[in-house]
A protein has these predicted regions:
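Active-site groove signature of glycoside hydrolases
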Residues: 107-127
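Conserved small/polar residues in nucleotide/adenosyl-binding loops
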Residues: 149-155
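Active-site cleft segment of glycoside hydrolase catalytic domains centered on the general acid/base Glu
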Residues: 90-93, 122-145
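Short, acidic/polar
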Residues: 29-40, 92-105
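Active-site mouth loops of central-metabolism enzymes
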Residues: 21-31, 82-94
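Generic structural signal for well-ordered alpha-helices
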Residues: 38, 61, 65, 100-101, ...
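N-terminal binding-site loop/beta-alpha segment at the start of enzyme catalytic domains
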Residues: 1-76, 110
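Active-site beta-loop-alpha junctions enriched in small/polar residues
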Residues: 20, 52-54, 81-85, 117-120
């Protein structure tokens, strides 16, 4: 499998297994089919699994957890996401912590490689997005359940 550099982070397979299909976003499949799909993808050289709690209401993350039972192959990277939506700025850090904890539990992992805050974080409040949300993600990197974080921020007009 051809590899490519993921930004300044690591080399990963040119193909990524996204969680939409195994989260049953496009139609019903069995858990067994989804687990087999993830395992086969990794066997064939896919090294990046892109998950999110919104892919099947946590099902995609649960499938990865079932596929590897906490024993992810060393060369496989996992990303997941969290959506803050209109969270009160005073509750952002707790919202991120609890969302990440739930994802890790479903994935049966102690850490993920890349954690995205998925969406415009607080579209009407740019300052909260930049000055509250970014610092609230730093604990995850320092405490090591996440290797890297990435924010999708609204642009300030």
């Amino acid at each position: 499998m051809e590899t490519r550099q993921l930004g300044g982070l690591w080399p990963v397979s040119a193909l990524t297994l996204g969680g939409g299909g195994i989260g049953q976003l496009w139609g019903e499949t069995t858990r067994e089919e989804c687990v087999a799909t993830v395992q086969k993808a990794v066997d064939l050289g896919i090294t990046l699994l892109d998950m999110a709690p919104s892919y099947g209401n946590g099902e995609a993350e649960s499938v990865v957890g079932a596929a590897f039972k906490g024993n992810l192959p060393a060369n496989v990277r996992v990303t997941t996401k969290h959506r803050l939506g209109e969270t009160n700025p005073k509750k952002i850090e707790q919202n991120i912590r609890s969302g990440l904890a739930e994802s890790l539990k479903r994935l049966r992992l102690e850490r993920v490689d890349l954690f995205f805050l998925h969406s415009n974080i607080i579209p009407h409040d740019f300052d909260a997005s930049v000055y509250v949300t970014r610092p609230a993600t730093r604990w995850a990197v320092y405490k090591e359940p996440v290797s890297y974080t990435h924010l999708t921020l609204p642009t300030k007009a």
